[in-house]
């Protein structure tokens, strides 16, 4: 005969199988989100990156990077762009982007207020209305900032 108490003491695997199923569902959900989720940042964030990237390229006098963040209509000639940048640095110091606000996106065009300051007058903030366009799949600055 079997002892009735021995069957009651035997552990069951149901809680472990249930926990394993929940963990598997969570892992599957994470994988699906990573595969099908949107990796591209919002357009407003891309506009801000374009403003900062263009300014950084100018400060480093890197015309190739400047072109990456500038629309074709505003790219100009390398010698002229870099000469204006050197002149601006000599007069006002390096230019820094403090903020990009009031971003408004309308299809492949956008506007934003970009706030700058210069090294020689760090407390004098200059807010400039800038325009941006989406060219070749990327947002690019399509107006000139203060120099």
Positions of PLM-derived features:
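Surface-exposed, charged secondary-structure patches
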Residues: 3-4, 41-42, 83-129, 145-147
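Sequence contexts marking disulfide-bonded cysteines in secreted/extracellular proteins
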Residues: 70-72, 141-145
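Short, low-complexity N-terminal intrinsically disordered segments enriched in polar/charged residues
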Residues: 2-59
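A short, surface-exposed beta-strand/turn
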Residues: 125-139
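A broad structural signal for short, well-ordered beta-strand segments within beta-sheet-rich domains
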Residues: 47, 95-97, 141
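Alpha-helical membrane-embedding segments
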Residues: 36, 73-86
């Amino acid at each position: 005969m079997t002892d009735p108490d021995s069957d009651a003491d035997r552990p069951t695997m149901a809680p472990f199988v249930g926990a394993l199923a929940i963990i598997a569902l969570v892992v599957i959900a994470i994988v699906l989100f990573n595969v099908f989720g949107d990796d591209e940042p919002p357009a407003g964030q891309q506009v801000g990156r374009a403003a900062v990237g263009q300014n950084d390229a100018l400060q480093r006098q890197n015309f190739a990077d400047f072109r990456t963040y500038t629309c074709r209509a505003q790219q100009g000639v390398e010698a002229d762009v870099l000469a204006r940048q050197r002149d601006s640095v000599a007069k006002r110091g390096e230019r820094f982007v403090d903020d990009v606000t009031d971003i408004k996106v309308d299809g492949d065009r956008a506007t934003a207020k970009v706030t700058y300051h210069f090294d020689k007058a760090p407390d004098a903030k200059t807010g400039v209305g800038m325009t941006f366009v989406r060219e070749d799949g990327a947002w690019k600055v399509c107006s000139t900032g203060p120099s």
